[in-house]
Amino acid sequence: MSEKQFYLLQVNDALFPIGGYSHSQGLETYIQRGIVHDVDTAREYITHKIKWNLAYTELLSARLAYEAAKRNDLEELLKLEEILEASRIPMEQRDAARKMGSRFAKTIEKLNLWVSEKGIFREYLEARKGKAVNHCCVYGVFCEEMQIPLEDALSHYLYAQTSAVVTNCVKTIPLSQTSGQQLLSGCYGEFDVILKDIMSKNEEDLCLSAPGFDIRGIQHERLYSRLYMS
């Protein structure tokens, strides 16, 4: 493996300090309402989450950001950021994407990686100074700047985000660690379908989702007791 492939593993690792563990993205509402309460309901939730919410918002955004960065199209990147800002309906999830994006960028800065001072990554962050930087977007730009193949960037991101959802289910429902691993490995058959599908989509498909995820995200803001920030 090359050095850049290890960096790809690092930025997708659960220990990479962007605060993703603090967010359930509405899952906590599903659990408190008894909708997600065991292995079977967790499997249904995870499958729909990755096929709709994750695929058409985060994964597609990462791909579009990567391709815009490859073209050095700063205007398209800024447009993508504005679309993401406008399309995330739950307030807590907007804030989560901003915070994780900001922390991702700041952590990358501290790693002293080879990132051109005149490259699109620096130009993009400078243009977004004082504004929101979404995690999926900055991730896509970073991967292109590091010359990481698009397929690798997307597959690692999909695995990492799915693993995070499974971990939240295990901790919060709760489920056994073995059940969590079974749920995660059970998603692998969907990964290839999702990755192939997302490569054929364009900006018009961005943020296509199931409204139930947004509704539970909004309801999370008013839960009496909460373990997660979203």
Residue ranges of predicted features:
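A short glycine/serine-rich beta->alpha loop
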Residues: 8-17, 46-52, 86-93, 122-129, ...
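A contiguous pocket-lining binding segment that forms or flanks enzyme active sites
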Residues: 128-173
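Inter-helical turn/loop segments and adjacent helix faces that build the functional surface
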Residues: 30-40, 111-118, 145-153, 172-179
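Short, mixed-charge aromatic SLiMs
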Residues: 44-57, 87-88, 127-133, 161-170, ...
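Internal, conserved structured core segments that host functional sites
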Residues: 59-64, 71-143
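C-terminal auxiliary extensions adjacent to catalytic cores
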Residues: 160-230
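Glycine/small-residue-rich interface belts in oligomeric ring/scaffold proteins
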Residues: 4-72
